[in-house]
Curated annotation (Swiss-Prot):
It holds the Pfam family TFIIB. It comes from the Archaea. This is Transcription initiation factor IIB 2. GO terms for biological process: transcription preinitiation complex assembly. Keywords: Metal-binding, Repeat, Transcription, Transcription regulation, Zinc, Zinc-finger. PROSITE patterns: TFIIB, ZF_TFIIB. GO terms for cellular component: transcription preinitiation complex. Transmembrane segments: none annotated. Sequence repeats lie at residues 124-207, 218-299. Zn(2+) binds at C11, C14, C30, C33.
């Protein structure tokens, strides 16, 4: 039950915790099933309207909010690359070479040493990987904060920037209970999965992250959504996982494999069968793993389906 005025923590339709606040439309949306949970959220943005970026800049009375995604936290002045002045007029060609030199030196001053240069590159990489994964800005901000803490404690030494960035994203996703698999992050970043896992364990230990272990429930909505399976399949999958966990079948086994096997069974039960190959592709586990988990679950729960 949700107390009046309190923000819901789970989607009432699919029970997912992956909720996104759309401030522009005043809505709280489930990222997994698309349900609009709230539609009357008060817009805390400016009272004025702007119809293009130039008008937006002219009407704004404050700068951009502080962000961990910029090496200077967004507090420094930036010179626009649009070749327009404050009033939106184009800068004459005769002055553009001078503006280019000013802009170039300004960039050099903003990133004045190797440490700042490395941080700037790392945060740009974090932004790029985050965009490929489709994760919201608040998770990227959390990942950037984790990365900054790693830099402060000198945890980057002896490891690649890429692996620590990926590990920070993985940790941030787990922290807000919207886990992404190591396979997903590896594909988006082209960094070896084992290196990411090793870097993550290093960060978790040294930064004392204390993240709870992921469970099969964390992946079911996400996987079902990718497989175009409805709420009924999600409910059945979760019920199968619940029974499997109560019988100790999931002990010592990867949560993604258990979730994938449960979804395989559920998809057949709801009349929308998905092949083990399809499920393996979106879950990042092998067909052999799905087959083994399926056999263990079906035997323990006495489930019989026509494959």
């Amino acid at each position: 039950m949700t107390v009046e005025g309190e923000t819901p923590k789970r989607c009432p339709e699919c029970n997912s915790e992956h909720l996104i606040r759309d401030y522009e439309h005043g809505e709280l949306i489930c990222a997994d099933c698309g349900a609009v949970i709230e539609d009357a959220y008060i817009d805390q943005g400016p009272e004025w309207r702007a119809f293009d970026s130039d008008q937006d800049e002219r009407r704004a009375r404050t700068g951009s909010p502080m962000t961990y995604l910029s090496h200077d936290k967004g507090l420094a002045t930036e010179i626009s690359w649009s070749n327009k002045d404050y009033y939106g007029k184009r800068i004459p060609h005769k002055n553009r070479a001078q503006i280019y030199r000013v802009r170039k030196w300004h960039q050099r001053i903003r990133v004045s040493n190797a440490a700042e240069r490395n941080l700037s590159l790392a945060l740009q990489l974090l932004n790029d990987i985050g965009a490929k994964l489709g994760i919201p800005k608040d998770i990227k901000e959390t990942a950037a904060l984790i990365y900054r803490k790693a830099v402060e404690k000198n945890l980057i030494r002896g490891r690649s920037i890429e692996s620590i960035v990926c590990a920070s994203i993985y940790a941030a996703c787990r922290k807000v209970n919207i886990p992404r698999t190591l396979d997903e992050i590896s594909k988006a970043s082209e960094v070896n999965k084992k290196k990411i896992g090793k870097a993550y364990r290093h960060l978790a230990k040294e930064l004392d992250l204390n993240l709870k272990p992921t469970t099969p429930f964390s992946y079911i909505s996400q996987f079902c959504n990718k497989l175009d399976l409805d709420k009924q399949a999600i409910v059945i999958s979760e019920d199968i996982v619940r029974q499997a966990m109560s019988m100790g079948i999931s002990s010592g086994k990867g949560p993604t494999g258990i979730a994938a096997a449960a979804i395989y069974i559920a998809s057949v039960k709801v009349g929308k069968p998905r092949t083990q190959k399809e499920i393996a592709r979106i879950s990042g586990v092998t067909e052999v793993t799905i087959r083994n988990r399926y056999k263990e679950i079906s035997k323990a729960l006495n489930i019989s389906i026509s494959e």
